[in-house]
Amino acid sequence: MNCWIALEKKAKALRDQASDALKIVRDQYQEQQSLLNRTQELAEQYQRKLAVLQTQPAHFGDVQLYRTSLKQLQHGMFQIQQEITRLEREVTIRQRELKRTEIERQKFEKLIERERDLDRAREELKETRALDEMSVQMHFRKQNLA
């Protein structure tokens, strides 16, 4: 039974590692999602400013600066979206790994429980045999006394 316990401990450690790795990737995903939201808000602000500048007489350099900045923000959003997509795939992979390690741990847990049940059954069988033996001896003693 000790081997099953050792294997279960190892499986628990692997499960905990997989869980930690999944948490890290999820945190990165949330961080990138937050960054994307902030970048989108900033791009929308620049878009509104650019629309206002184009309706009013403004310096061409200001308009050009907003256009350039807006393109850079759009390029940044594209890169962030690519990173989010990569992290989504990574989350899926980590979730599968966590599920696999949890199933492995549960397998060893069931083996340990089965081993304990067998030990209990063996112990009960020993007790039953001992009681049967005592009953037989008492029966013979009663017969010999009679």
What is the predicted role of each segment?
Residues 1-146:
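Charge-rich amphipathic alpha-helical interaction elements
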